[in-house]
Amino acid sequence: MGKRRRARELALQSLFYVDSTSAPPLEALDLFCQNFPPPKDLAQFFYELAKGVINNQDEIDRLIEQHSNNWKLYRMSAVDLNLMRIAAYEFLFCPDVPRRVSINEAIDIGKRFGTAESGAFINGILDSIHLHLGKEEKAEKKR
């Protein structure tokens, strides 16, 4: 398994923990990392993802909700939602990561940690976001 996959899985676990506690998100992340320190070779990408999602969660959640036809975020499984948050963060803030890679990683990790339906659910929402962002970028280039 690649380093980035392992960093994404650790970011998922940390965000799951952050969601389950009443502590401020960055404090909860620090506590998670005290108990489960990320390996040095994963730390940079892990922290970029985990802190990036936490610091941009409102924007990311709005984007997910816009593309999750008739699904409210609170009804989604924590695994599926946090995987989509990680992928959406990569879409918006990690131009070096191809969006298809982010989608495939979220699907594969969702199949491992989520339910039997996680892969298809994650794929549907992330693909919609990917298409939407692609259209916005094309429109920007035409200007």
Curated annotation (Swiss-Prot):
Xref: Pfam families: NusB
GO CC annotation, single: cytosol
Keywords, sorted A to Z: RNA-binding, Transcription, Transcription antitermination, Transcription regulation
Coiled-coil residue windows: none
GO MF annotation, one: RNA binding
Database matches in Gene3D superfamilies: NusB-like
Listed GO biological process terms: DNA-templated transcription termination; transcription antitermination
Transcription regulation is among the record's keywords: yes
UniProt family annotation: Belongs to the NusB family.
NCBIfam families listed in its UniProt record: nusB
Functional note: Involved in transcription antitermination. Required for transcription of ribosomal RNA (rRNA) genes. Binds specifically to the boxA antiterminator sequence of the ribosomal RNA (rrn) operons.
Protein name in UniProt: Transcription antitermination protein NusB
Species assigned in the record: Desulfatibacillum aliphaticivorans
Primary gene name: nusB
